[in-house]
């Protein structure tokens, strides 16, 4: 399952623009609890050849989910929830 988030206080901790890995959020960042930081992946059915990097974590209850960072809450809501395959690089 793939979901989306943005840097709003209700979706993050007290440092909404810093990832769990200590980097600044940017396009191409994903949160995942089941992959190590730095893992590169693609979501070809949704984003073609675009490469994402795991730099963030989610609440522990989301064990097999990828959460894509979007710049705005509206973009994250528009993306919604998708079921797709991830290609680990």
Language-model regions: role of each:
Residues 1-89:
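Solvent-exposed, well-ordered loop and adjacent helix/strand elements within mature globular domains
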